[in-house]
Swiss-Prot record:
Keywords: Golgi apparatus, Membrane, Transmembrane, Transmembrane helix
Gene from which this protein is expressed: LYSET
Organism: Sus scrofa
Broad class of the protein's primary localization: Golgi
Membrane topology type: Multi-pass membrane protein
Name assigned to this protein: Lysosomal enzyme trafficking factor
Protein's UniProt keywords contain Transmembrane helix: yes
């Protein structure tokens, strides 16, 4: 039976054992210590960040198109609406008149919420999953406040008995 390698030094912990055919370093041990939810959380975070990096380039292409369409909209703005315009054309012209930072905020909030949810799945305690999501966070804070008010009301009803 071969003796397992000693990873007490940092330089040894980053090397692969020769001849065993599998990784048995500290990263492998940390991965084995995680439960299934944590592993899937880290995989989800990695895939989410990879998809975000791919979408980042696409967003800047949309930004250039958005700026071009917005400038065309400003330059060709008729004073009164034409008779042949449809509701989709009207909606498109109204949405193009909104600034780009507004659209960025609209898409950034759900993006960050999803990232924080995936990141919370990597935590060891399953009770803390989802606390970073705004509606759940607000519900927890309100519930704590109501519990505090209820407890303080119960304490104020108690009569003080002097002995």
């Amino acid at each position: 039976m071969p003796k397992p390698p000693d990873y007490s030094e940092l330089s040894d912990s980053l090397t692969l054992p020769v001849g065993t055919g599998r990784f048995s370093g500290p990263l492998h041990r940390a991965w084995r210590m995680m439960n299934f939810r944590q592993r899937m959380g880290w995989i989800g975070v990695g895939l989410y960040l990879l998809a975000s990096a791919a979408a980042f380039y696409y967003v800047f292409e949309i930004n250039e198109t958005y700026n071009r369409l917005a400038l065309e909209h400003i330059q060709q703005h008729p004073e009164e609406p034409l008779e042949g315009t449809t509701w989709t054309h009207s909606l498109k012209s109204r949405l193009l008149s909104l600034p780009f930072w507004f659209w960025t905020i609209i898409f950034l909030i759900p993006y960050l919420q999803m990232f924080l949810f995936l990141y919370s799945c990597t935590r060891a305690d399953p009770k803390t999953v989802g606390y970073c999501i705004i509606p759940i966070c607000l519900a927890v804070i309100c519930n704590r406040h109501q519990a505090f008010v209820k407890a303080s009301n119960q304490i104020s009803r108690l009569q003080l008995i002097d002995t």
